[in-house]
Amino acid sequence: KEGSQINWILGERSNGKSYQVKHKKGILRYWCDGVNYHANYKNKNEVIEECIKTKTRRFGLIRRLQEEIKPSVALNYFSDIDVYKITDGKYNTFDIYRERVYLANYDMDTHKTKRGEFIGYLVALSIEQNYAGGSFLDITDLVFEEVITRKIYLKNEPSKLLNLFCTVDRKRGTTRLWLPGNTISRVCPYFEEWGMDTLMRNIKQGDIKSVWIPTGEVDEDGVPVEVKMSVEYCKSTGRSSFVIGKHSE
């Protein structure tokens, strides 16, 4: 909504933050690109088929620890998504193989899963340095669940997250980082290290505030690279009231 590369979405539990982010910035962004860019095709099925052939966008799901990206754990994240409905019956489940997320089909008779479209990556923040030499130019959106936690944060965690973000974006300015979180505490290492203390003290429900933060990198002219960061404090209502933008943006 603000055109920011780093986007906090804060609010009470169970108000739809995570659900909307994983749909709009993960599954739907990948699957429905064809609806926007191939509208000249005759029908929805043709659009989807063409979309499958031409997809280049993927998401990255960030977890704090390595054990959280194991298939048995990570698959729970997608358990509330109706894959069959979204894909018009083409797929009925997800599969994770070598830290990659796939649309897939599970056969009730053979009890086997057949992988289909590769749609996203799983990454562990605790080992962000391991990704430094990799290429993730197909990632358009990064999502870090439970960025605010009652548990223990990693040492230098805000710096690790910025390093990971820079590894993926490669100074292209095209990657978006989504940080849905519950406002269970305003004491958070990110708020201090990213200069958000004043913003968090003054922000009110329904507000969206933006600041610029340094990434620690410099451009080819030696000028420090900054990214725009926005914080949305969702209204407290019985239903989701925040807007994170259309999935096609």
Predicted feature locations:
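Phosphate/NTP-binding elements of NTP-utilizing enzymes
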Residues: 1-249
